Regions:
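ATP-dependent carboxylate activation and anion-phosphoryl transfer catalytic cores
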Residues: 2, 8, 27, 32, ...
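A short, GP-enriched loop/loop-strand-helix hinge that lies immediately N-terminal to
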Residues: 19-67, 80-127, 142-150, 568-575, ...
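A conserved helix-loop-beta module that forms one wall/lid of the active-site cleft
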Residues: 110-179, 661-722
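Catalytic core of soluble alpha/beta enzymes
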Residues: 116, 157, 183, 213, ...
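C-terminal amphipathic alpha-helical interaction region
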Residues: 498-550
Length: 938
C-alpha cells in the first residue's frame, strides 16, 4: 500500500528533558522519524522542551516548538498550524501519555488530527496491567499469576493470595518507576504505597516473582498488511528481577534454543497482530524457565523504546526511520533496506558479530542511595561493544564505561574480600560483572556463582575463560607472548593496557611489540544487516582481529570527531548535540567526517550522520589504531566533553594535530596552578586557592585562603567529588574521599565566595576577534553547580559595570590562551567585583541552549573556525530572542527514595528544559527567584 497522500503535515511529540528511564534514545528516534517524513515531502512540526536535542533543530524539522510538553502547547500548535496527523511513538512514555490525554479530551477529534503509529486500544491494553494480563490469557500465552490493586487494602489481599516473593508493577510508568520486588511482609507496605503513588491511575499489578528465569526481548516491526519481522533478539545477561535498562544485554541471544526462539517469535507475531491496527515498531519481553523452557509474557511496548535504539545500532536496521514510513501507510515490502539499498526492508537482519550493552550508573552522585539493582531503573546511560565474540564485545564495552577500569580484570582493582564480593554478586550490585570476575579469580566454584546469581552457565564459563587467560599471561614476560597467543588474547578483547599490567610493561611497549614485531593489528568490519551476504552502502564499522579489512581509506582530507561516550551526570546529551553539529560542519567544509563513539542511544552514532562511523570505545588504543588506519588531518576533542579532552595529551605526544585550540592552551585552562598564574599575569581577580597532595597539606592551604573552602579534584566534569567545607575535620573527610576515587590527584582548595552571584559566558575566538555567544546569569547563588542552576539568558540583574568586566575578562583569556573555537568561562560576582572561577576550552553544556535561544548555529561557525576555513566576520549574528530564556535543570531524585535533595558544587541533574518568558514579571520566574537559596548545601 503506498503512502497516505492526505497527510501533508505531521506533529512529532518529543520526550522532554533527560531523566533516568528516558534518555537520548528518543532524540535519536525523533530525529530519524523527522528526516524520514521530510524525505516524503511532509512538513514536520516538533514539540519538545529539551534544548540539548538534535530533533529540535531547524536542520531536522520545519517548525520547532521549544515549549512544555502539555495540553496547552498541543492546543497552541493546532491553532497555529495546519496539522493533519500526530506521531506520538517517538517520544517515550511522555509523548504516549500526552497523546492519550489529548485523545480523552477530544482534542485530536476537534482538530481533525489523525493519530499515526499508535492505536489507543493497544496503548490501553499494554499500559493497563490488568488489561494486558487478560489479553495474554485470551491469546493462550502464559503470564505470571497476578492481581490488580487500586488501593492499599486490595494490594494486601493480593499479596496474601500470591505469597512472597512478589513483584509490584505500577500502570502507565516508565523505567520501572515505583516498581520493585518484595521478599517479605516487612517490605510490603512501603513498596505498595510507593507503587500506588507512582502510577498516574493509582493502579498496580501484584505479581508472583519469577526470580531467576531468563529474560529475552524481541524488537519487532509490523505493517498495515500484518507483515511481520523480528529485527533483533536481545538476551539479558542478568536474569529476571533486574530492569532491562539496568541489565547487561547481549545480541544475538546466546543461550536460546531454536525451539524456544520459534515459539517466542510466534507469540510475538500473535501479540502484535492481534493487539490493534497500528503499524510500526514494538518491543516484546518474555521470561523463560531455564529448566523447563516454559515461556511467560512480561510486557510489550507498542512504540519505539530504549531497546529499539539498541537494536537499530546492533543490527544497522533503522527502526525509527522505517516505523515513520509504516505510520504513513507504506508496507515493509515497499521499502528498501537502508544499509544495502538493494534488498527489501521486509527481512530479518543476520548478525555475524556480537554486541554487548552495559549500563552506566552514577550512584556516587546520590549519597546514601540503595545501589542494589531491581525492577526500577537506576542507570543514567549505556555503552555498547561490538566484537566477533561475546568475550571481545564484553571487554570493549567494559573499556567504554569510563569508570577507571581498562577492561574486565587485569588492572589491579579487584575486590580482595570474598564476603564483600559475594554480597555484591548475590545482591546484584552495579559492578556485579567485575565482582563475578574477581570471585572466579579467588576460586569460588562456578556452581556456587550460578546458584547465587542465576546467570546462565554459558556466560559464567565465558568469563572463566578470561580469568584463565589472565592467569596464563601473568606467568609470561611480554616477549614470551608469541604471535598465536597474542592474537588469541586480542581476539578475546584484552586491551594493551591490560597486557601491560600483567607483563609489568607499558602500553606503548605492548603496542610496539604487537604491531611492529608480531604484525597483529585491528581490521575494520561492516555492520551490514546481512552477515556480508549483500554489499553494504552504509559506512558503519567496528574493529576486530581478523584477516580482511572492510573499511577502504579514501584520498579525501579527513577529520575525526571524538564522541562523549556514555551519558552520565555532568556529561550528557548536550555534548552529543555538539558532536553532530561538528560533523555536519566538517562535511560542509569539504572534509570527510569520521565519528568515533560507543553510545548506542545517540544521534552521533546514527550511520547517516558522518561519512564514516566507527562504533568503538573512546579509549586511547582504539583511537590510536584508527588514526594509523585513516591518517586524518587532525582530531577534534573540543566537542565531546571531558571524555574527548582527556585524550588530547596522548594525541599531542603522538604528534597528531588537535584541531582548534592547542593541547598546551587546554592544559593551562585545566591545570589550576598554570591557570591562576595566567590570571595573575592578566590582572584578573580569582578566589585565593592552593593545591595539596594529602589532608595535612590541604589544612595548611585552608588556613592560608580562609574557610569556607571548596575542595575538588583536578580534571573532572560535573563537579565530581567537589565539596564546600567549613572546618579541618570536614576538609580531611573530603580529601580522603577524593584520593580514594582519584589516587595521586592534585587536590584543589579554593576560598569559597559565600553569598556571591554566579554567571557564565560562552564565546568563540578565531585568533583575531571574540564573539560572545551568550551571557547567562544563574538564579541560584554561587555554591550550586552551574549544571544544577537555573540560568537566565540574557542576564536579568547584573549591572552594566559587571557585564563589561565579564566581556573584558573573556576577551583577555581567549586571546591569552589563543583559543580556536569555543570557550566557556564561569564567574562569581561579589560586591560588584567579578572573579573568574574557571575556564573550559571546549563546548559546554550550555552551548546548545544558547544556540536554541538565539536561533544561531554557533556550533557550525565554531567548527569551521577550528578548521581554519572561516573567520567570525564571515558569519551573521541576528539574536532572535524576545524577553528571556531560562535553562531549567531536571532531576531524577524519585528513582532514589530517601536520598537528600540538597544541591551543592557536585552536579546532580540528569537533564534540562528551556522556558521562554516575556519579562521578569512572569509568575514562573518570580517563584524560581523566591526559592533560589533553598536547596544549597555543602
Amino acid at each position: 500500500m503506498p503512502k497516505d497522500t492526505s497527510i501533508k503535515s505531521v506533529l512529532i511529540i518529543g520526550s522532554g528533558p533527560i531523566i533516568i528511564g528516558q534518555a537520548c534514545e528518543f532524540d535519536y528516534s525523533g530525529s530519524q522519524a523527522a528526516r524520514s517524513l521530510r524525505e516524503e515531502g511532509i512538513e514536520v512540526t516538533l514539540l519538545n522542551s529539551n534544548p540539548a536535542t538534535i530533533m529540535t533543530d531547524p536542520v531536522v524539522a520545519d517548525n520547532v516548538y521549544l515549549a512544555p510538553i502539555n495540553i496547552d502547547s498541543i492546543v497552541k500548535i493546532l491553532n497555529e498550524r495546519q496539522i493533519d496527523a500526530v506521531l506520538p511513538t517517538m517520544g517515550g512514555q511522555t509523548a504516549l501519555n500526552l497523546c492519550m490525554e489529548a485523545y480523552e479530551l477530544g482534542i485530536w477529534e476537534k482538530f481533525n488530527v489523525k493519530v499515526l503509529g499508535a492505536d489507543f486500544k493497544a496503548i490501553e491494553t499494554t499500559e493497563n496491567r490488568e488489561a494486558f494480563r487478560k489479553f495474554m490469557l485470551e491469546l493462550g500465552i502464559q503470564v505470571a499469576p497476578s492481581y490488580v490493586a487500586n488501593s492499599f487494602l486490595e494490594g494486601k489481599e493480593a499479596a496474601q493470595k500470591i505469597g512472597f516473593p512478589l513483584v509490584i508493577r505500577p500502570s502507565y510508568t516508565l523505567g520501572g518507576t515505583g516498581g520493585g520486588f518484595v521478599h517479605n511482609k516487612d517490605e510490603f507496605d512501603e513498596k505498595l504505597q510507593r507503587g500506588l503513588a507512582a502510577s498516574p491511575t493509582h493502579e498496580v499489578l501484584v505479581e508472583k516473582a519469577v526470580l531467576g528465569w531468563k529474560e529475552y526481548e524481541l524488537e519487532v516491526m509490523r505493517d498495515m498488511n500484518d507483515n511481520f519481522v523480528v529485527i533483533c533478539t536481545v538476551e539479558n545477561f542478568d536474569p529476571m528481577g533486574i530492569h532491562t535498562g539496568d541489565s547487561i544485554t547481549v545480541a544475538p541471544a546466546m543461550t536460546l534454543s531454536d525451539t524456544t526462539y520459534q515459539k517466542m517469535r510466534d507469540y510475538a507475531k500473535l501479540m502484535i497482530t492481534r493487539i490493534g491496527t497500528f503499524a510500526g515498531g514494538c518491543n516484546v519481553q518474555f521470561a523463560v524457565d531455564p529448566v523447563t523452557e516454559d515461556i511467560i509474557s512480561v510486557e510489550m511496548n507498542p512504540r519505539v523504546s530504549r531497546s529499539s535504539a539498541l537494536a537499530s545500532k546492533a543490527t544497522g536496521y533503522p527502526i525509527a526511520k522505517i516505523a515513520a514510513k509504516l505510520a504513513i501507510g507504506y508496507t515493509l515490502d515497499e521499502l528498501k533496506n537502508q544499509v544495502t539499498k538493494t534488498t527489501s526492508a521486509f527481512f530479518e537482519p543476520a548478525l555475524d558479530y556480537v554486541i554487548v550493552k552495559i549500563p552506566r550508573w552514577n550512584f556516587d552522585k546520590f549519597a546514601g542511595s540503595d545501589e542494589t539493582l531491581g525492577l526500577q531503573m537506576k542507570a543514567v546511560g549505556e555503552v555498547m561493544g561490538i566484537g566477533r565474540s561475546f568475550q571481545e564485545a564484553l571487554q570493549k564495552a567494559c573499556q567504554s564505561l569510563e569508570n577507571n577500569r581498562i577492561g574486565l580484570g587485569a588492572d589491579g582493582k579487584q575486590w580482595v574480600s570474598a564476603d564483600d564480593m559475594l554480597q555484591g554478586v548475590g545482591n546484584a550490585s552495579w559492578d556485579r560483572i567485575f565482582r563475578l570476575y574477581d570471585a572466579m579469580k579467588l576460586g569460588v566454584p562456578l556452581k556456587t556463582l550460578q546458584e547465587v546469581t542465576r546467570i546462565d552457565p554459558w556466560y559464567l564459563n565465558q568469563i572463566m575463560e578470561l580469568v584463565d587467560t589472565e592467569k596464563k599471561l601473568r606467568k609470561l614476560s611480554l616477549k614470551q607472548i608469541d604471535a598465536n597467543l597474542m592474537r588469541e588474547v586480542k581476539e578475546k578483547g584484552y586491551s594493551d593496557l591490560q597486557i601491560a599490567y600483567l607483563t609489568n610493561t607499558t602500553e606503548d611497549e605492548v603496542y610496539e611489540y604487537r604491531t611492529k614485531e608480531l604484525n597483529i593489528r585491528r581490521v575494520y568490519k561492516l555492520v551490514d544487516t546481512c552477515a556480508a551476504e549483500f554489499e553494504a552502502k552504509t559506512p558503519y564499522y567496528y574493529s576486530t582481529f581478523d584477516t580482511t579489512n572492510e573499511s577502504p581509506v579514501s584520498d579525501k582530507k579527513k577529520i575525526i570527531v571524538l564522541g562523549s561516550g556514555p551519558n552520565r551526570i555532568g556529561q550528557g546529551i548536550e555534548f552529543d548535540y555538539c558532536c553532530v553539529h561538528g560533523v555536519l560542519a566538517i562535511k560542509e567544509a569539504g572534509y570527510e567526517a569520521i565519528m568515533m563513539n560507543c553510545n548506542p542511544e545517540t544521534v552521533s552514532t546514527d550511520p547517516d550522520i558522518a561519512d564514516k562511523l566507527y562504533f568503538e570505545p573512546v579509549f586511547w588504543e582504539h583511537l590510536r589504531e584508527l588514526i594509523e588506519h585513516e591518517k586524518p588531518e587532525g582530531v577534534i576533542v573540543q566537542l565531546g566533553g571531558q571524555t574527548a579532552l582527556k585524550l588530547a595529551e596522548n594525541l599531542h605526544n603522538m604528534g597528531v594535530k588537535i584541531i582548534g585550540t592547542s593541547y598546551d592552551s587546554m592544559d593551562i585552562a585545566e591545570d589550576r596552578e598554570r591557570f591562576s598564574d595566567l590570571l595573575k599575569e592578566l590582572n584578573i581577580p580569582y578566589p585565593d586557592y592552593g593545591a595539596a597532595k594529602n589532608a595535612e597539606e590541604a589544612i595548611e592551604v585552608a588556613k592560608k585562603v580562609g574557610y569556607p573552602v571548596l575542595v575538588r579534584p583536578s580534571y573532572v566534569l560535573g563537579g565530581q567529588r567537589m565539596r564546600i567545607v567549613i572546618n579541618d575535620e570536614e576538609l580531611t573527610q573530603g580529601v580522603v574521599k577524593i584520593l580514594k576515587f582519584f589516587p595521586d590527584n592534585n587536590i584543589l582548595i579554593d576560598h569559597f565566595l559565600d553569598r556571591a552571584e554566579e554567571a557564565e559566558v560562552d564565546a568563540i575566538y578565531d585568533g583575531e576577534q571574540v564573539e560572545i555567544m551568550g551571557i547567562m546569569e544563574h538564579i541560584e547563588p554561587a555554591g550550586i553547580h552551574s549544571g544544577d542552576s537555573n540560568a537566565v539568558l540574557p542576564p536579568y540583574n547584573l549591572s552594566e559595570n559587571v557585564i563589561t568586566q565579564m566581556r573584558e575578562y573573556t576577551e583577555k583569556i581567549a586571546r591569552a590562551l589563543d583559543i580556536r573555537g569555543l570557550i566557556n568561562i564561569q564567574f562569581a560576582i561579589k560586591n560588584e567585583k567579578v572573579y573568574v572561577i574557571e575556564a573550559n576550552p571546549r563546548a559546554s553544556r550550555t552551548t546548545p541552549f544558547i544556540c536554541k535561544a538565539y536561533n544561531i548555529p554557533y556550533l557550525n561557525y565554531a567548527t569551521k573556525i577550528m578548521l581554519g576555513v572561516n573567520k567570525l566576520k564571515d558569519f551573521t549574528y541576528y539574536k532572535r530572542l524576545l524577553g528571556y530564556a531560562i535553562k531549567e535543570p531536571v532531576f531524577s531524585f524519585d528513582k532514589f527514595p530517601g536520598v537528600s535533595r540538597e544541591l551543592g558544587p557536585e552536579m546532580k541533574s540528569t537533564g534540562e528544559s528551556i522556558r521562554f518568558i516575556n519579562d521578569l514579571y512572569d509568575p514562573y520566574f518570580r517563584d524560581l527567584y523566591k526559592k533560589k537559596s533553598m536547596m544549597l548545601s555543602k
